[in-house]
């Protein structure tokens, strides 16, 4: 009888640990809109989630440590006139977040360090160029102020947020149908897209050229999602002809056959992939699922190795993924997800069991830091650069907020002027405004009491 050889991996025993009740965000109203995005975005400072709101689209932003029950009157980011479909934090400024909406606009917002004290209605800049709803927003990983948006008009626009102008356009000639997913390569030289026309494309956005294309990576009719992984490969999730969910790994230079194709189950939810380039682990989270599967990608066959699955009782309505610099390295945490329930956001820590409390260098290689490697102008001129790396050995402390400056130049004449955002007010100004509000409330209370006394006098006569 031959012995089965088990592949050695330091991630074989990774396990998921949900946060305790007091470390969750309770009593939040998660959006009911049907759309295949995560509906949640997190960074080392803030947690943001798309929520139900009357009279337009809104999302909630809370300081990361402000857990527990969320007040029903908590101020929201509420400048959109229709439901918000996607949100994304800027990788180079933890106070800046972009949102795409059914109102056909992209808005970029600046959140003060302590969070919002008043509703935020005016964005730093509104980016107008799509003719149908905007379902995807994605920041360039290494170039400052470069933002991509994809709309249901089958158009991808790349914006220079610093000027408020669209600098690149990929029109319906590239994607003739709805775009399901867009992902930047690690150095931002390429994008990978999946489309309703059943094709996955690798595109050089500055030239507008498709450098690789795969027709029907999965035989089913349900949406496909695609992300870049290590060494020029892409990973796709989709469905078989028999509606079984699948995950596949592809070499972009040889797309004829997948390097690996695995069937998972027969659930109907679209699988959202999250890839960690530091560990080469990809996590698969399905909306409507109650589990997170994770796989390790290696450079030798069979390339894609199933590790394990975290399961819970309640299904997820969305999922946020924390950047590596927001993790607790002293607890050997290699990933953290923010699972959206119907009325709650629950952090889930993915941990490698280790006996020592010392920094584990093999788990934490230098990771992408918060500083951009390029300006928007440098990237547009043809330069590419990988992320500027930082060590997490001594922990990571988020820097104080850096103001986002927008210089519209000649473009301002044809776009609506954007007033100074309330989020840039100083703490002294905010304190004065809060005091004014309290004084006004006191005056209103006194007037109400006076009115009540007058009514009693009139009734007595």
Curated annotation (Swiss-Prot):
The gene is Coro1a. Residues 407-418 have a biased composition (Basic and acidic residues). The modification Phosphoserine is found at residues 2, 412, 422. Its main location: cytoplasm. Keywords: Acetylation, Actin-binding, Coiled coil, Cytoplasm, Cytoplasmic vesicle, Cytoskeleton, Membrane, Phosphoprotein, Repeat, Ubl conjugation, WD repeat. Residues 420-430 have a biased composition (Polar residues). Belongs to the WD repeat coronin family. One of its GO terms (cellular component) is plasma membrane. One of its GO terms (molecular function) is actin filament binding. This is Coronin-1A. May be a crucial component of the cytoskeleton of highly motile cells, functioning both in the invagination of large pieces of plasma membrane, as well as in forming protrusions of the plasma membrane involved in cell locomotion. phosphorylation at Ser-412 by PKC strongly down-regulates the association with actin. The modification Phosphothreonine is found at residue 418. It comes from the Eukaryota. Residues 425-461 form a coiled coil. Residues 407-431 are annotated as: Disordered. Pfam families: DUF1899 (PF08953), Trimer_CC (PF08954), WD40 (PF00400), WD40_4 (PF16300). It is found in: Cytoplasm, Cytoskeleton; Cytoplasm, Cell cortex; Cytoplasmic vesicle, Phagosome membrane. One of its GO terms (biological process) is negative regulation of vesicle fusion. The modification N-acetylserine is found at residue 2. Transmembrane segments: none annotated.
């Amino acid at each position: 009888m031959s012995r089965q050889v088990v592949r050695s991996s330091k991630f074989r025993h990774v396990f998921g640990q949900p946060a305790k009740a007091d470390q969750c965000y309770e009593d939040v109203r998660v959006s009911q809109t049907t759309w295949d995005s995560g509906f949640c975005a997190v960074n080392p400072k803030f947690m943001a989630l798309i929520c139900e709101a009357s009279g337009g689209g809104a999302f909630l932003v809370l300081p990361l440590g402000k857990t527990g029950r969320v007040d029903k009157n908590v101020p929201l980011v509420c400048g959109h006139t229709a439901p918000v479909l996607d949100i994304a934090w800027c990788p180079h400024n933890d106070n800046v977040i972009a949102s795409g909406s059914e109102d056909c606009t992209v808005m970029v917002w600046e959140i003060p360090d302590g969070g919002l004290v008043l509703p935020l209605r005016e964005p730093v800049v509104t980016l107008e160029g799509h003719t149908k709803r905007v379902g995807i927003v994605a920041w360039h990983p290494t170039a400052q102020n470069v933002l991509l948006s994809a709309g249901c008009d089958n158009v991808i626009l790349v914006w220079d947020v610093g000027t408020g102008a669209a600098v690149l356009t990929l029109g319906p000639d590239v994607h003739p149908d709805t775009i399901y997913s867009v992902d930047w390569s690690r150095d931002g030289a390429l994008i990978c897209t999946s489309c309703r026309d059943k094709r996955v494309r690798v595109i050089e956005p500055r030239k507008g050229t498709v450098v690789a294309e795969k027709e029907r990576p999965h035989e089913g009719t349900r949406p496909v999602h695609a992300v870049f992984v290590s060494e020029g490969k892409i990973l796709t999730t989709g469905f078989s002809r028999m509606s079984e969910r699948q995950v596949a790994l592809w070499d972009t230079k040889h797309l004829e056959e997948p390097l690996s194709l695995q069937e998972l189950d027969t659930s109907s939810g679209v699988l959202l992939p999250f890839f960690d380039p530091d560990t080469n682990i990809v996590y698969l989270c399905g909306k409507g699922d109650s589990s997170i599967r994770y796989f390790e990608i290696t450079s030798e066959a069979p390339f894609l190795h199933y590790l394990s699955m975290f399961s819970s009782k309640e299904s997820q309505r969305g999922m946020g993924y924390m950047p590596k610099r927001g993790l607790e390295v002293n607890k050997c945490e290699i990933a953290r997800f923010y699972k959206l329930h119907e009325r709650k956001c629950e952090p889930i820590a993915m941990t490698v069991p280790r006996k020592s409390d010392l920094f584990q260098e093999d788990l934490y290689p230098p990771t992408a830091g918060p500083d951009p490697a390029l300006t928007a102008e440098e990237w547009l001129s043809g330069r590419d650069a990988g992320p500027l790396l930082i060590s997490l050995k001594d922990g990571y402390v988020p820097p104080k907020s850096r103001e986002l400056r927008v210089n519209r130049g000649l473009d301002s004449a044809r776009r609506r002027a954007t007033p100074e955002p309330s989020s840039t007010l100083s703490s002294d100004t905010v304190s004065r405004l809060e005091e004014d509000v309290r004084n006004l409330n006191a005056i209103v209370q006194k007037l109400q009491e006076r009115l009540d006394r007058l009514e009693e006098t009139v009734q007595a006569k």
